[in-house]
Amino acid sequence: MAEAVQPSGESQGAELTIQIQQPAERALRTPAKRGTQSVLRVSQLLLRAIAGHQHLTLDALKKELGNAGYEVRREISSHHEGKSTRLEKGTLLRVSGSDAAGYFRVWKISKPREKAGQSRLTLGSHSSGKTVLKSPRPLRPRSRRKAAKKAREVWRRKARALKARSRRVRTRSTSGARSRTRSRASSRATSRATSRARSRARSRAQSSARSSARSSAKSSAKSSTRSSAKSWARSKARSRARSRAKDLVRSKAREQAQAREQARARAREQAHARARTQDWVRAKAQEFVSAKEQQYVRAKEQERAKAREQVRIGARDEARIKAKDYNRVRPTKEDTSPRPAEEKSSNSKLREEKGQEPERPVKQTIQKPALDNAPSIQGKACTKSFTKSGQPGDTESP
């Protein structure tokens, strides 16, 4: 079978798919060489048509095959299905497409044979219709033709007789050979059957003995394996139960240890938190006390500084007054000139001021909260030193 496909070919607006196939009956009846040559020729023509035409159509394909001396006819019967039994000539083409689908038979147009006693010129003259002179060669008489026919018939009869004799000889030789081969085959078959029966009996006996031994061995092995399997299963179950119990005990102990560790960690965290809070409270209290002490010390220092300044101012004033009084009481010899009135007024003012006593610093006491004993003692010492230094008799030199 040969195929030739033209994907772009169109026959009345449809694509062509061409397939060449040869019926099986003709392939069996006719010689193979002749059929293959015809199929090859048709396939070559199809390939040439496909290569020569860009868009191959069914009409163009018919023209190409007609020019090559082939005739194309649509196949209507169901030969491709294998139902027809008559002998058909030519090759079968299967064309698939929308409008050109179907089977087509292609065969070579046979040339007219030349009759005996006629030349090609006479045939050409008859076909063309022109009157041409006959050949000078005379025709054979009818008697010769009859003699030739009889000779052919005799020859055919002799050939048939020879064929029949050869067939009879062949059948006799084949029948003798067949009888001999049959006897030999029967003897061989009987010997083979007896040997097979003996071998089968022996094999059956051996197989029965082996099966009995195997069954006994299997039964004993099964019983032993069952008992061993049961004991093994029991030991396995016991070991598994023990391992499970041990695992449970270990897991419980681990859980208890973890719980204890967690409780200890919580207690430690709580103790650390309490210690931190206590330290924070103590630090806050110490900061408060230190701040109070600093405020108290600063206030004391400020009071002392103020008292010292007042004492210095008073001592200076007293020294000035004394100096003035001393200068007034003891005048110098050189200074015998009368003093002006302004000096007299100033001296009178000084006397009046002298008559008035200077203000003494008042001892101030500040109540301090009883926080610690050390700062209170220091405060008392400071007050004592202040009172001693603040006496009117303690004067600094100007």
UniProtKB/Swiss-Prot annotation:
Testis-specific. Specifically expressed in haploid germ cells. One of its GO terms (cellular component) is chromatin. Residues 204-232 have a biased composition (Low complexity). Residues 244-285, 298-362 have a biased composition (Basic and acidic residues). The keyword DNA-binding applies. Belongs to the histone H1/H5 family. This is Testis-specific H1 histone. The lineage of its organism: Eukaryota, Metazoa, Chordata, Craniata, Vertebrata. The gene is H1-7.
